[in-house]
Swiss-Prot record:
The name 'sigmar' is an abbreviation for salivary glands marred which describes the mutant phenotype. Disulfide bonds: none annotated. Its main location: cytoplasm. GO terms for molecular function: cysteine-type endopeptidase inhibitor activity involved in apoptotic process. This is Protein salivary glands marred. It is found in: Cytoplasm; Cytoplasm, Cytoskeleton. Disruption phenotype: Viable and develops to adulthood. However, pupal salivary glands are abnormal with large empty vacuole-like structures, tubulin disorganization, and reduced autophagy flux. Salivary glands appear normal up to the wandering larval stage, but then exhibit a slight increase in overall length until in pupae 23 hours after puparium formation, salivary glands are significantly longer and wider. Salivary gland histolysis occurs but appears to be delayed. GO terms for biological process: positive regulation of apoptotic process; positive regulation of JNK cascade; regulation of autophagy; regulation of microtubule cytoskeleton organization; salivary gland morphogenesis. GO terms for cellular component: cell projection; cytoplasm; cytoskeleton. Belongs to the TNFAIP8 family. Important for modulating JNK signaling, cytoskeletal remodeling and autophagy in larval salivary glands. During salivary gland development, involved in the positive regulation of the JNK signaling pathway, acting downstream of the TNF ligand egr and upstream of bsk. Interacts with the Ste20-like MAP kinase msn.
Amino acid sequence: MADNVFKSHDIGLRAQKKILSRMATKNIAKTFIDGTTASLLDNLYRLCKMHTGNKAKAEKLIKNIIKIVIKIGVLHRNNQFSDEELQKAELFKRKFQNTQLSIISFYEVDFTFDLPYLQKSIAESQVALKSIVQPHLTEKSLGRIDEVFDFFGEEALLETAFRPDSPYREVMGKIVADINAAMETGDI
């Protein structure tokens, strides 16, 4: 019987997630996101576009990142996560930071790139994130998470991005600088 009770808070939360996800363009996101994070998203867009050769696919990936971040932010701001989910969030944060540190190291130190290690790190971050948000997001949103992590864990992208003579070397340098700056300020 309790499932049929009208809950305006739940409807309000769903409306917030829906409205914000529809507004998730790079320009709108810049009003919610600091300069370093915006720069990181712009550089990730450039990397995606270079790798795929497809502007629409690159835009979709970045929009998916923005939508995911906004929805998680709405859930967090509205205290929707249980204590257990908050503990899982700390685990995700550690795993994601390890992934970021690996990216920095593999870029800065030639011939240290370890594809299986990085793919495992990305996959573990994906699983950790989904374990937190699964009860709160739709299958479509969970699919967005998979699409983003699957793209950035793709062998061809990673192998090309971390080659010392990579055609992505310049944009990877900017991404690494953005990650370093964001980690220093605690933005990611």
